């Protein structure tokens, strides 16, 4: 994509860049987009471990029907905060804040984000939010689920519930600030030689994500502020006995929280569109279709939220409308899946760790999408609403989708961030354990849901015990899968093989600078002369010319 193809030879030692950041700079209040990106990733991963420990504790409780491993109130608090942490403090910050901050300026040829100080502020709102969330356990912990529906959220552990609300508002503010920054950066700061049809697909995904967050997040903030007033100041926005309406809260909550699924998956789709062509050594199939499908998901995704409320007294016409809109939003997603499959077809695929997680994502997301189609239709959803069928669905989509994609991105861009390669043997072990653990844990939950086991309960009918025990064993396998990943990260960051500037032979602009990049990314800004996914085009052109010469 730049003027000159970078060599793929690997140096013997990591070069010293006088203008590169040192390790201790990552612990400071820094405005450089790369430092902030790493800070997002590391902080989010710490919360991922905390949320994962809560999940293991809950699965241990659910291993048997009469277990007393967790106090019921503590189980409810773990349930609430596990979901909250995994969504608001792991996937969203890692995908948008982590990869978005690190990669977008590098991919468009900018020296930093448009508003560096605003960028730093957006990150530094996250650690206090997480601390506030964890501190709520000193007051019993929020126990109303990650949805925090009233009236339950207004009568249980009200101090902890208020802390939960304030934490989410802080994270939402961070999201809004970051969205403004990404939109301005992509729109105004790409190098003059880069046309819109040369913009990397990850940047298209980040643009769509930012637009969606900017529209939906303030609605959640408004709904939570009203809930905070009901809890602490005697208002009655959601109190039916005083003229309020709890269904209004559901509308406000889901208007953000279903688009939040796309906030978590759109950047991951962008990562997929970068990883697959590089490691398949083929141009991406359907560049424009993938770019426009991100914008289509952004638009249609704002009109599907009521499928979470089919059992909340919604009228038939509303059920019909939102069933149709839910099925329509699957179309642009299908465009991406088929484009990735077409890109893989006939490619020279390198089955390294990044590519394995990308392919794993495709299989997991398709499985989750199939159950999503059934949940999007009102007649089926009414029967399996609030059962483990729903739990299985969203874990296949969000863990099998988002987390697999985050792992693919880490294995792909770790050499750029650190200058060193991750160990492939540990990476493949990590992938195998994660794939087995994911299916072992969540696939049996479909059976639990179809047989009627409700979600969010610590005690259940003994008939469900054998399947729950299977799920719990799978959860431990999934938990242990993180160990080789952590060993790989820590060891490779210090002792890993030197990567060189472009170990994968990538054509997007981040591969034209040093690894790790300079403080201002480049000594001289790059010039774009070809597309970001023109892999093998020159060889095919040479082959065509030779065939033409032979015919003559």
Swiss-Prot record:
Pathway this chain belongs to: Energy metabolism; oxidative phosphorylation
Reactions it catalyzes: 4 Fe(II)-[cytochrome c] + O2 + 8 H(+)(in) = 4 Fe(III)-[cytochrome c] + 2 H2O + 4 H(+)(out)
Residue intervals passing through the bilayer: 35-55, 85-105, 120-140, 164-184, 211-231, 252-272, 284-304, 321-341, 355-375, 390-410, 426-446, 470-490
Protein residues bound to Fe(II)-heme a: 82, 395
Family matches, as SUPFAM superfamilies: Cytochrome c oxidase subunit I-like
Cofactor note: Binds 1 copper B ion per subunit. Binds 2 heme groups per subunit.
InterPro entries recorded: Cyt_c_oxase-like_su1_dom (IPR023616), Cyt_c_oxase-like_su1_sf (IPR036927), Cyt_C_Oxase_1 (IPR000883), Cyt_c_Oxase_su1_BS (IPR023615), Cyt_c_oxidase_su1_bac (IPR014241)
Binding site for Cu cation: 258, 262, 307-308
Pfam annotation, one family: COX1
Stored PANTHER family: CYTOCHROME C OXIDASE SUBUNIT 1
Functional summary from the UniProt entry: Cytochrome c oxidase is the component of the respiratory chain that catalyzes the reduction of oxygen to water. Subunits 1-3 form the functional core of the enzyme complex. CO I is the catalytic subunit of the enzyme. Electrons originating in cytochrome c are transferred via the copper A center of subunit 2 and heme A of subunit 1 to the bimetallic center formed by heme A3 and copper B.
Protein name, per record: Cytochrome c oxidase subunit 1
Species whose genome carries this gene: Thermostichus vulcanus (Synechococcus vulcanus)
